[in-house]
Structures are given as structure tokens and as C-alpha cells.
Amino acid sequence: RGIFRPDRSHAKSARSVAETMGNYHPHGDASIYDTLVRMAQPWSLRYPLVDGQGNFGSPGNDPPAAMRYCVTGDALVRLPFGQSVRLRDVVAGARSSSDNAIDLKVLNRHGDPVVADKLFHSGEHETYTVRTAEGYEVTGTANHPLLCLVDVGGVPTLLWKLTEEIRPGDHVVLQRTPPTEFGPADWQDAFEALHLGAFISEGFVSENRAGFNNLDREFFNAVLTAYDTIVGGPRYVSSRTIASDSLLHELDVHNLTALKKSRLGELVGQRSADKAVPEWLWKAPAVVKRVFLQALFEGDGSCSALPRNTIQVSYSTRSGRLAKDIQQMLLEFGVISRRYVHATGEHKVVLTSRAQAELFAAQIGFGGIKQAKLQGLLDALPQAAAGRDGDYVPGLAQFVRKHSGSRWVDKDWLNRHNIDRLSRWQRDGAEILGRIADPDVRAIAQELTDGRFYYARVASVTDSGVQPVYSLRVDTDDHSFITNGFVSHNTEARLTPLAMEMLREIDEETVDFIPNYDGRVQEPTVLPSRFPNLLANGSGGIAVGMATNIPPHN
């Protein structure tokens, strides 16, 4: 209560809700925040117990603002149809500490489109970066909540955790629902994406000259057609036999006048280590991004068979920024990858499971002859996948086995089989559910294994310094939106002097304390309550079929 005293500055509503949920009410934050809002509304309580700062609704049933939390402006907010936008670019030139009305459709935690109606530029604050073992990152303030998978008394539960509460070894939720696509790509955007991907991988654009080469004649011709259509101007084409006895096809451009006027002009003079996905491409729909990734992987990507009947798809680059961008764009298609720095200094993005290789082949693929090689490797695998991969629900197997309520024969089957891997649920989900007797256990298992989420282990939470931070107000019950694949949540408050009277002398052995739900902290059985809240503000309830109401008193 010391943080929320009336003689101190207002604290973020997020912090109040998170501490209540973490210590006393592990059943979601909506009811906690609704209660906080009601206690701040003078038309709801005769004597409000919370001093709210911000939009806490109105007597005319205008809804309160969502709890405000903040991430850095470079975070990519996911939009419908596979589009995305940097948070700082939602409102160009937004002033520090400003509220900006918007009308933007974003995706919520389930991958469904919802409306964001406000962008908050919250000024500059201390920030922290959450990084997963795979290399996914998001940076935000200490009070920014991310959706996590938490063990609550042995039950794997989706709960919000503040960045300051997240520790290495925790599991954060990444949204990986493939985008909804609507119609074919605009031909100009598709051509621009094709030759952008090709030139980033196997081309160069210096101040005075540009070029591209590739061994695949059909892919080379596709890039050449795109170049002539989008850029135009003089260029030279040739072929030569290289040391491996392969025929290399080359495009050479000496006059860059036309090229500099096109979107390829962004690459002029760019070093290999500085390559990145341009902002216009992030805002493009999935059908355009797919063309870019196909060309990119056909250039510097590869696929190969690994032991234990699995396949690796990888991309190598000298640019750490490009590797990070590629990993993020793959995630937008639902493909999970790992990012790391090789001993040679190259940054690698790799898919090391059969399931992800199959998803890559189906959702994206290579842009040329390498796709046939990948499909051949996949076709050669046995029909049923063997072994274990990293795509699983932590704690699910133990929970199901302990609480299934099943017959002995079904319990024995559940104990002997791997039931926490997503690949197993996709293949044998009906059989697993048929062996779980308890309907609540079945419901929990189905929600966690429907494929929407990837449960990524946190590798580190590090200080990222003071940065400008932003947030969105989303017009839904849980106020969720997607930032860099992480599920983000989105008023400030403090107690009133009357509320402090309800807590006065609580630390002086005036009431009894008992362990909370998980035994980590103590909670009071009652409040000292020198202020008679039930009489002053009134109350109501139902017990044994009889309604009881106490009207408010002066």
C-alpha cells in the first residue's frame, strides 16, 4: 500500500492490477481493473476509494481507458492481411507525452482484427529488453505486461506479467497465426519485392554500379523481368562458367540514373552489414512479403537433411539487423526460427525442425530451384515424425497426467506418450482428448495446443536505457495487441485518504494473516477498516438464493 498512498504520486494502473493478480487473484486482470475503475468513479461510489488520473469513464457509460503500458517506437505492431507498422509511425511526428486519436485495425492476442483508437506517446522512460532463447526481442518499460505461460499451482495458465517480473527461464507467448490473405498481390509491389529480395541476397548497389548474379536460369530471368519492369534503363546480361563448372548468369548496370529513382535506390552505397528490410515492405500485405522472402532465400538461403529425420532451412547474412528482420517476418507467417551469430561472424536464421520446414515450404518456400530440393527432402521423410522438437507447452504433460481423471488404461497411455508437443497434438489431438476424462482439463489442453501461440523460453531481460515509449488503446476487453510477435497489454491511480483509513494499522497485528493462494506472501483475513465502507458506499450480493442489498449511507 506504500506505493499507492494518497500523499505520493499516482502509480500506473498496470502496476496495481499486476500486483493484485500476482499476489491475491490469479484469475485474469479484467475483473481487477474493472473493480479499480469502479472504486475511482464518484457516480459509482458515494465515497470513492481510488483517486484516478486519466480517463476512468463517465456517467453516460463511456468506457474507461485501458491500463497504459509502453514499448519502444521500433516495435512492429501487427495489422490485418499480414501488414505491420512501427509503433512510432502510427502517428507521424507525435509529440512527447501526447494522446493521439487514431482509427487503426490491429490484431489481438488471437490474431483477430480489432480497433485501436488512441496512440499514446508517453515520453522517455527507462526500458528493458526481453529476449528469448530463439532471439525474439521486445523492449518496453518495467510496467509493460506481456502474456506469459505461468505455472499456477501446477496448472499451465496464460497470465500477464510485467517486464520487471519476467525472469530468465520464464515462458512468454508469441502469436503465430498465419495472416489472412485477400486477393493477389499488386503486380508492381510484387516485382519490387522480388528484385529487392534478390539484390539484398545476391546483388550489390554501389555509388556507380549495380549487379546481380544467380545459377538458376529461371529465377535469374524472373529477376531480370522485374528489373526491366520496375527500373528499366540500360543494363548488360552475360553468363560465364565458374570454378564449380556451373553456369553463372549475371546482370550488370553501369548507369544508375533509373535505379536511384526506384525503391532499389535505398540500397545505393549500403554495406552488407547494414542491410535491412525497408519500412515500405513492412507495411505491405503478406502476399508481397512472401515474394520478397522467396527471392531472399533463393539467393542466400539453403536447405539440408539432418540426422533423426529432420531438415534444416537457413539464411546467412553479414547484417544482424537483416537477420532480426527476417526472423520477425517469418514469424508473421507462423514460422518459428532461431537466430544466432556463427563462428565466422555471419548472422544465421535457422529452422531446425521438420514441422517448421514443412510450414516454411507451404507458407513461403524458395523462389526457384531450391524449392524443388526442399520438397524432395520433405517427401523422403517417413510419414510420421519421430523424436521431439522445441515446439511444446511447458507443464502441460504433467498437468494432464495428474488431473486427467481417466481410467487406469488411459492414464497409462498418457504416461507413456509424449503429450506436450504441438506436433503430437496436430496429429493425434483427438486420441489424446479421448483419453482425458475431466472436461476442464480437456478445455485447458485444447486452448493451449490450438497452434495460435508459441511458448518461448526467456533467455535474458536487460537494461536498454532511457528511450521514447509508446502505447495503443485497443477497444476490446483485454486490450491486447501484437508487438514484435509478443502479446502486449494496454491509467494511473492511488488510494484516497478514506481508503487509507481502511488499511490503517494493518501492519500492527490488528488482524490475522493467512498464506495467499500459492504460499509466497501473506494476506489479511479482514481489513482493520476504521472507515465503514459497507455502510458508506453500500453493497449487494446473493447468498443461498436470497438477494441482500445495503444502501449507501452518509
UniProtKB/Swiss-Prot annotation:
Keywords: ATP-binding, Autocatalytic cleavage, Cytoplasm, DNA-binding, Endonuclease, Hydrolase, Intron homing, Isomerase, Nuclease, Nucleotide-binding, Protein splicing, Topoisomerase. This protein undergoes a protein self splicing that involves a post-translational excision of the intervening region (intein) followed by peptide ligation. It is found in: Cytoplasm. It catalyses: ATP-dependent breakage, passage and rejoining of double-stranded DNA. Gene3D superfamilies: Hedgehog/Intein (Hint) domain, Homing endonucleases, Topoisomerase II, domain 5. GO terms for cellular component: cytoplasm; DNA topoisomerase type II (double strand cut, ATP-hydrolyzing) complex. GO terms for molecular function: ATP binding; DNA binding; DNA negative supercoiling activity; endonuclease activity. Residues 195-335 form the DOD-type homing endonuclease domain. Residues 1-554 form the Topo IIA-type catalytic domain. Few gyrases are as efficient as E.coli at forming negative supercoils. Not all organisms have 2 type II topoisomerases; in organisms with a single type II topoisomerase this enzyme also has to decatenate newly replicated chromosomes. This is DNA gyrase subunit A. The keyword Isomerase applies. Heterotetramer, composed of two GyrA and two GyrB chains. In the heterotetramer, GyrA contains the active site tyrosine that forms a transient covalent intermediate with DNA, while GyrB binds cofactors and catalyzes ATP hydrolysis. GO terms for biological process: DNA topological change; intein-mediated protein splicing; intron homing. CDD domains: Hint. Its EC number is 5.6.2.2. The active site is at Y69 (o-(5'-phospho-dna)-tyrosine intermediate). Belongs to the type II topoisomerase GyrA/ParC subunit family. A type II topoisomerase that negatively supercoils closed circular double-stranded (ds) DNA in an ATP-dependent manner to modulate DNA topology and maintain chromosomes in an underwound state. Negative supercoiling favors strand separation, and DNA replication, transcription, recombination and repair, all of which involve strand separation. Also able to catalyze the interconversion of other topological isomers of dsDNA rings, including catenanes and knotted rings. Type II topoisomerases break and join 2 DNA strands simultaneously in an ATP-dependent manner. SMART domains: HintC, HintN, TOP4c. Pfam families: DNA_topoisoIV (PF00521), Intein_splicing (PF14890), LAGLIDADG_3 (PF14528). Transmembrane segments: none annotated.
